[in-house]
Regions:
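Carboxylate-rich, polar loop motifs that coordinate divalent cations or form catalytic acidic clusters
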Residues: 1-330
Length: 330
């Protein structure tokens, strides 16, 4: 009887201990520093690391090379952004302005576009930010020009960057309106007829911060702004107001903001772990924080990216570990 009682008491402890799973270089990950996490419609997890692109099928990793002719591109200037477009295609873009598309049939990444080298001889990294909008365009941004690559026609349009600032992130509001975060602040803009036009917005125009990440919720029309050592701010388009939550996270840098569900956001930080915020009340609480005294607890607080899958598992790019997975279903 005592034996069975001991096992019953031990069982819940065992379940809690299995909350976290770790994936590192010893498991096949190419590098401990992971920048982006994506999941395709087949179910594979994709990781953009310091060394290249890894695919994980739940058991093992496969590494992919980025080739420009006979030359492998493995420098940090070519490993910067990993996105999945609205049609489910995987794209990798680098600061040198080279765009790769994943070819599922041949299981390779194909170089489909690169900025003309002769136009940027003095700039080793001409692109400060790249992003995919809802209109089938990949944005290649620098301080003077925005190059729009049409993923369907493969045509490239040049748009003057009227901000004259380094762009760090973009969120699309509707077909032609955008929030654009830069090194200097945040702007409301319209892209129409291949012209980017700034739109006046008193509240946003007076916010002088270095924007790291943006998240826009179209249902409640709120923009969540993650800054470098300035915490999180919320711009409400309905009331035209800016709010900073009581737990402002000003002592850490915000790396990523992702929706956990319809009412809550996850806020990843560089040094403070992950926080959870209510989108209505802005109540912010620690959610996933390192516990170095626990054998099977969270094992790091420097989070570059997060991904919440359909099974409610949270995949974290957790330096210097690699990938940490939290599974609350255990």
């Amino acid at each position: 009887m005592k034996k069975w009682l001991f096992l019953l008491l031990l069982f819940p402890l065992t379940c809690v201990a299995q909350t976290y799973q770790y994936l590192g270089v010893e498991d096949g990950l190419s590098n401990r520093r992971v920048y982006y996490i994506q999941k395709d419609n087949v179910g594979y997890m994709w990781f953009l690391t310091h060394e290249g692109i890894d695919r994980y099928n739940g058991k093992e990793f496969k590494r992919y090379k980025l080739m420009d002719g006979d030359k492998e591109l493995n420098s940090l200037l070519n490993l910067n952004w990993l996105y999945i477009d609205p049609e489910g295609t995987l794209w990798e873009i680098g600061k040198k302005g080279k765009i790769f598309r994943y070819d599922r049939i041949h299981d390779t990444f194909e170089l489909v576009y690169k900025l003309p080298i002769e136009d940027f001889k003095d700039l080793p990294a001409p692109i400060t930010f790249s992003w995919i909008d809802h209109n089938n365009h990949i944005w290649l941004c620098n301080e003077e020009t925005i190059f729009l690559y049409n993923t369907r026609t493969e045509e490239v349009t040049h748009v003057k960057n009227c901000l004259s600032e380094a762009i760090n992130d973009i969120e699309q509001i509707d077909e032609s309106h955008y929030f654009i975060g830069t090194e200097m602040g945040i702007h409301h803009a319209q892209l129409k007829n291949n012209t980017l036009q700034l739109l006046p917005c008193d509240k946003l125009d007076n916010v002088n911060i270095q924007v790291n990440d943006l998240h826009f919720d179209p249902k409640i029309r709120k923009l969540f702004i993650g800054a470098f050592e300035r915490g999180v701010m919320v711009y409400d388009m309905n009331t035209k107001t800016i709010t900073q939550p009581e737990v402002s996270l000003k002592d850490v840098s915000i790396s990523r903001i992702k929706p956990l569900n319809a009412k809550e956001l996850l806020i990843a930080t560089d040094g403070g772990g992950i926080y959870k915020m209510n989108v209505d009340t802005y109540q912010t609480v620690p959610f996933i924080v390192a516990d170095y005294n626990s054998y099977n607890g969270m094992n790091g607080n420097s989070i570059n990216d997060i991904y919440i899958d359909d099974e409610e598992r949270i995949w974290m790019a957790n330096y210097p570990i690699g990938i940490t997975i939290q599974n609350n279903r255990y």
